[in-house]
Amino acid sequence: MVVEFKNEPGYDFSVQENVDMFKKALKDVEKELGQDIPLVINGEKIFKDDKIKSINPADTSQVIANASKATKQDVEDAFKAADEAYKSWKTWSANDRAELMLRVSAIIRRRKAEIAAIMVYEAGKPWDEAVGDAAEGIDFIEYYARSMMDLAQGKPVLDREGEHNKYFYKSIGTGVTIPPWNFPFAIMAGTTLAPVVAGNTVLLKPAEDTPYIAYKLMEILEEAGLPKGVVNFVPGDPKEIGDYLVDHKDTHFVTFTGSRATGTRIYERSAVVQEGQNFLKRVIAEMGGKDAIVVDENIDTDMAAEAIVTSAFGFSGQKCSACSRAIVHKDVYDEVLEKSIKLTKELTLGNTVDNTYMGPVINKKQFDKIKNYIEIGKEEGKLEQGGGTDDSKGYFVEPTIISGLKSKDRIMQEEIFGPVVGFVKVNDFDEAIEVANDTDYGLTGAVITNNREHWIKAVNEFDVGNLYLNRGCTSAVVGYHPFGGFKMSGTDAKTGSPDYLLHFLEQKVVSEMF
C-alpha cells in the first residue's frame, strides 16, 4: 500500500550538522564539475563534438559541464526511439508506472543534497532555494504517481438496462518537454515525468543554462529501471532544434515554461497540422508574470514590507511568481516603502556557495536586460535602493527598489525577471485592484488587508491564477497551491493539482450491450 502523500522537507540550516553536511555536498559536487555530458537516445549515451558550455553564473570562469548539442538528425532519432518505446510503455498498468516513479523519487531523496548542491553551482541558487527546488521535484513525482493511481480505473458513468458503460483514461503518445533554468530540477522533473507516469514518452530538451542538473535526472531514471527510449535527452540550441521539436509530426504535446515570446511562438506553431499528423497537438505553457502585492490601509506595515522584500528578491527575483509591483495605499505608502528599503539593505549578495541570501542572475543576457530596466526605472521613477551591477566575475545585480511609478510605466508593465520592484501609490482599494489588473499577465498576486470586504473583492476581481492573503506571492507548495496563471501567463495548467495529468491523457468510453 502506498503511504499518504506528504511534502518533502528541506534542511534546517540553523543546525550546524546540516550546514556541515551541505558544505561537504558542495565540495563533493565541485570535484565532478567540468565533465562532458552526452545526449541520451534510446538509452544510448552519445557524445558530440559540438557542445553547450554550462557555467557558474557566480563565477564565470568555472565550467559546470559541457553538454553535447543535438542536431535535427539526433532529434529525429530520438522521436523514433520514443515512438518505439511508447508501444510497450503504454501497456504498463498505471500502478506499475506509478510505482516506478516512486522508486525514482526515493533515489532523488537519497541524493537530495547532491542535487541541491549542483543547483547552487549551475543556477546560482541560494542554499535554501536549491534544497527547496530538489524537494519540490520529489513532491511533483510523488504527487503525480498517486494521481495516476487515482485515475487508473477511470471514473464512474451511468449504466442503463441492457447497457454497461466505462469511462477511462489512456495515454496520448510522444511529446516534448522544454523546462526553464530557474527551477532546473523541480519544473524539469515534474513536466517530464507527469506525462511519463501517464503512459507517454518524452523528448527532454533542457534549458541551455542548466543541462547538467537535467542530465542527473537521466542518470536517476536509468538507475530506477525506466525502459530505454521512454525519456530521451536532447540538449541543443533552440534556434537549431526548437522549432523542429515543436513542429514534428509525432509531437503530441509540448510542455513549456519560459518567456512569453517563446511560449506564444510554440502555441502558434503547434496549431499547424503537419503532413502525416492525424491529431491536434496540446500545449501546456507557463509564460511568466508581472506579479503584484496590494497593500491596503490600516495594516501591519512590517508584515507588508517583509512580504514585498522576500517575494521580490528571493532567488534574485528570478521566479515567475516574484513580486515586481508593490501597489500601496497612500496612507501607508511612505512607511511601507521605508521599511522595505531598510529590510533590503540587510540582504546579502554574493556567491551562493557561501550561503548568501541572494546570488547572481543567470547569464549575461539577463544581466544586461535587468541593467537596462534599472536605467529605465531611474527615468520613470526614483531609485530608492540598489541599482548597482557587477559582471566582473559573475552576474550580480543589487536588490533594487524604484518608487513614484505609474501603472503604465514600463517598469510596471514588462517582465524584468530580476531583483527589481516598483512602487506605485494608490488612493483606495478599488484603484489598487484596477492597477493590479492593468497588465497582460495574471499569474500570482497577494493582498495585505484586514478588511474582509476588500479581500472578497480581491478574490472576485484580482485576475490571477494564484492569490494569497496576508503573505507574499511566491512559494506555492505542491498539493496545497496548484500553480498556474491567467491571460498571457499561460494556459493555467495547474501544476501539482489533481487535474494536471489530464493534459496528457485521452478519455475513452466503452459501451457494452447485454
Swiss-Prot record:
A GO BP annotation: proline catabolic process to glutamate
Q: Could you give a GO molecular-function term held by this entry?
A: 1-pyrroline-5-carboxylate dehydrogenase activity
Question: Which pathway does the UniProt entry assign to this protein?
Answer: Amino-acid degradation; L-proline degradation into L-glutamate; L-glutamate from L-proline: step 2/2
Catalytic activities:
L-glutamate 5-semialdehyde + NAD(+) + H2O = L-glutamate + NADH + 2 H(+)
Superkingdom, according to UniProt?
Bacteria
Q: Which residues cross the membrane?
A: none
Q: Which UniProt keywords apply?
A: NAD, Oxidoreductase
Active site residues of this protein: E286, C320
Gene Ontology cellular component list = cytoplasmic side of plasma membrane
Write down the EC number.
1.2.1.88
HAMAP family in alphabetical order: RocA
Which family does the record claim for this protein? Belongs to the aldehyde dehydrogenase family. RocA subfamily.
What PANTHER family does the annotation carry? Answer: DELTA-1-PYRROLINE-5-CARBOXYLATE DEHYDROGENASE 1, ISOFORM A-RELATED, DELTA-1-PYRROLINE-5-CARBOXYLATE DEHYDROGENASE 2, ISOFORM A-RELATED
Q: What is this protein called?
A: 1-pyrroline-5-carboxylate dehydrogenase
Question: What is the native source organism of this protein?
Answer: Staphylococcus aureus (strain MW2)
> According to the entry, what is the taxonomic lineage of the organism?
Bacteria, Bacillati, Bacillota, Bacilli, Bacillales
The UniProt gene name for this protein comes to rocA
